């Protein structure tokens, strides 16, 4: 399937969705603390999104039961909010999407709950810094596979490994569109192959970072994804548009 090119009008609509996504995440960032349950946070985000005349994009998507993916400690993505109460030393990944007038925004971040270990601090910094490094490297005409190679290099040079089998993606009138953008260069694939980045494209980059092994395992809830190493993980994501031959973050907080 071809990668869609968005018109200026569509990018304006996607910017609106992205801004609301960022506002919802910023709300959660302010409210995350020891003593708060995951379900309380999920309700805060859902209430805010609905009060803004928008729809939580993840609720019901592929059957997901909640508005926010909340990935605790070793869970890297797709964690389901529960009545678990956050404790000092936890890390929590928050990934949410918003639909506004038929257009989608998508963003994620991983946050410390109070004081965390030095290793977890490095882990959280890795996914955030790798994301921002990749965004700053985007040029019109480069291959998406080059972007995957850049993401992998940024992750591994910080001493970590990317999660395998899951990836960034295009976004627009659907929450997941072409292309798929892995956080690593697949075996046997050349960086200078495949589709190129063009003006008007909109897509999500989302480094998912593991400590020792990138092979995934899906837990019994059939949603939560962990590394087979069982160690803590981290995830950051932004929606990006190519406007004026440069990358513009639509979900900047």
From Swiss-Prot:
It catalyses: Release of N-terminal amino acids, preferentially methionine, from peptides and arylamides. The keyword Transferase does not apply. The keyword Metal-binding applies. Binds 2 divalent metal cations per subunit. Has a high-affinity and a low affinity metal-binding site. The true nature of the physiological cofactor is under debate. The enzyme is active with cobalt, zinc, manganese or divalent iron ions. Most likely, methionine aminopeptidases function as mononuclear Fe(2+)-metalloproteases under physiological conditions, and the catalytically relevant metal-binding site has been assigned to the histidine-containing high-affinity site. A divalent metal cation 2 binds at residues 106, 169, 206, 237. Its EC number is 3.4.11.18. This is Methionine aminopeptidase. It comes from Helicobacter pylori (strain J99 / ATCC 700824). The gene is map.
């Amino acid at each position: 399937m071809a990668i869609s090119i968005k018109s200026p009008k569509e990018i304006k609509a996607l910017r609106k969705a992205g801004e609301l996504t960022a506002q919802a995440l910023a709300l959660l960032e302010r409210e995350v603390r020891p003593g708060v349950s995951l379900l309380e946070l999920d309700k805060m985000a859902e209430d805010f999104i609905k009060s803004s005349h928008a729809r939580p994009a993840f609720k019901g998507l592929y059957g997901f039961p909640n508005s926010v993916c909340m990935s605790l400690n070793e869970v890297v993505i797709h964690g389901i909010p529960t009545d678990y109460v956050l404790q000092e030393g936890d890390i929590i990944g928050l990934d949410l999407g918003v639909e506004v007038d038929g257009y989608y925004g998508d963003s994620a971040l991983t946050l410390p709950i109070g004081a965390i270990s030095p290793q977890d601090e490095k882990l959280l910094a890795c996914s955030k810094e790798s994301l921002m490094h990749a965004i700053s490297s985007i040029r019109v005409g480069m291959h998406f596979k080059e972007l995957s190679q850049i993401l992998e290099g940024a992750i591994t040079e910080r001493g970590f490994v990317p999660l395998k089998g899951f990836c960034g993606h295009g976004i627009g009138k659907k929450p997941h569109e072409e292309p798929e953008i892995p956080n690593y260069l697949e075996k046997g694939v050349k960086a200078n192959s495949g589709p190129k980045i063009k003006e008007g494209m909109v897509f999500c980059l989302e480094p998912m970072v593991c400590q020792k092994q990138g092979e995934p395992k899906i837990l019994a809830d059939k949603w939560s994804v962990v590394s087979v190493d069982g160690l803590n993980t981290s995830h950051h994501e932004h929606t990006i548009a190519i406007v004026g031959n440069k990358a513009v973050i639509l979900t900047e907080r």
